[in-house]
Amino acid sequence: MSNEKMENLLNLALDATEREREKSLDLDTGYDRAERTWEVIVKFGGTEEALRGLFAEKFPEEYDRIRITNLRNEYAILLLPEHIVELVAALTEIEYMEKPKLLFFAVNNGRRVSCINQLQTVGTEQGTLSSGRNLSGTGVIVAVIDSGIDYTHPDFRNADGTTRILNLWDQTIPADSVADPFPAENGETSFLGAPSGYFLGTEFTRAVIDRALEQTTERERFALCPSRDISGHGTHVTGIAAGNGRASQGRYRGVAYESPLLIVKLGTPGERSFPRTTELMQAVDYCIRKAQEYGMPIVINLSFGNNYGSHSGNSLLESYLDDMANYWRTSIVAGSGNEGASAVHASGTLRENITKDVEIAVSSYEPSLNLQIWKNYSDEIAVSLIHPNGTRVGPVRQILGPQRFRLGNTDILLYYGEPSPYSPYQEIYFDLLPVNEYIDSGVWTIQLVPQRIAAGNYDMWLPAGGVLNEGTGFLMPSEETTLTIPSTAARVITVGAYDGYFDRAAAFSGRGYTRETNQVKPDLVAPGVDITSCAPGGGYVTRSGTSMAAPFVTGGAALLMQWGDGDIIRLR
């Protein structure tokens, strides 16, 4: 199967066997084995009503199993029975379709080195700092889409003990599983559900959170609002962007300390896995809709990413975020990722008659590994894969559809991509899957033999370093174009990390240019080394990463929008 209106990874996932999908890091994402359904992202033409009518007409027997989550600007998340995915993609109204990708958090004296103090005057309640313009984020929403929040932490509460959180959408808590603390007029018990227009998780309003905070015991609080931040990542990020420092008498106060908060905990009910891009897109849509309801400008913080894609800014996720950054009074901030020193990117320029060997070290106990090669379609290259024991497959045929090989105790799944409306570059995708539990360790080699070269540039990416074992990576990596997606989006404010103690960029910080488009990224850097911020339980913890750098800029953007009365056009 090969459909040019579907991305390569989705084409391959539909062609892969169930065993191959289960063994792969990426191919299974978005597939529900029990229901035999796929979650996909689409860009379509027309209205939601027209799309629903089209599905009812074309797929009457399956219509009750089709779920549409409509996003702004003609994007949607669809849940489709497996056997109609390709048929839906072939519809004239569907412009392009992608599968979800996993997202990984970018974790590896912030306020002072960010020059925030000079913009604020602090009252005696939270200590005295040098006076400035007294910007605090008032009237500008800070939205954090992350691992959740400890809503009981003093830094996210007002002086009277009430919450600063306008709404909390926990995508991991099934709808209708939490009783509404405010009984219906007839006295019957009702249950909290997903936000209007969405099917995922449970939404908690400010009133519900305040009712939970009124309770005297932790058990009573979490019975009313059971949302927790297990990893502490989202709590830490929110504290940097907008914590008010009440638990530390102002010592660890965040940037936009009076901004109202919107919180989305990413995830899927019942799954213990990384969040997906489909959940992120719904979260962004939700936050902007809420900002419009409240009539306030909004800054959205994204402190995670992934490595799948051409890194050129043209995937549906990146295009969607670019569109949303121009919608309402919205700024979107993303960390550049922590792949700068993780050996997951290699690049070079091929010349005719000169063979290029790219070596990849694979450590022991690696359950699977995938590799993307991105090149110009006009370049003809013979590609071979060489096992650590010297056996090889290739040169592989440049044909559409999956190709399968076995080297040692490792199965190889290969897919050659073709042109598509959202991908003008060619992808060659290798998925190394274990015959038993682990793929073969040692040094693998990708051999590139130029046949006919027009441009010659190539880039290779492995998965984000956070999911690889230590020691797995390219032996000759490139530190450039190590941005994670979606920080490659053109209109997203991309933030790298620097070390404020030594006044230099952090080695782990992802960096550009973006591939082919050559856009300079990150747009700016912020403190990202040894940053102290909020931790679940009411205290503080120190962390490093571009996850910690991005919220400094998120808070700073809120101050700027407060100063400019939310006039995003003038501020740009």
Please provide the spans of the model-predicted regions.
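Autoinhibitory N-terminal propeptides
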Residues: 1-76, 83-131, 161, 269
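C-terminal subdomain of the subtilisin-like protease fold in secreted/lumenal serine endopeptidases
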Residues: 27-30, 293, 297-306, 328-330, ...
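Subtilisin-like serine protease catalytic core
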Residues: 128-278, 295, 329, 367-369, ...
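Active-site glycine-centered loops adjacent to acidic/histidine catalytic or metal-binding residues
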Residues: 146, 337, 545
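Active-site-adjacent substrate-recognition loops and nearby beta-strands
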Residues: 157, 308-318, 339-376, 380-402, ...
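Substrate-binding/charge-relay-adjacent region of secreted/lumenal peptidase catalytic domains
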Residues: 173-176, 194, 202, 206-207, ...
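Hydrolase catalytic cores
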Residues: 238-241, 249, 262-270, 288-298, ...
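Short acidic, glycine-rich surface-loop motifs adjacent to enzyme active sites
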Residues: 264-266, 284-312, 335-336, 447-451, ...
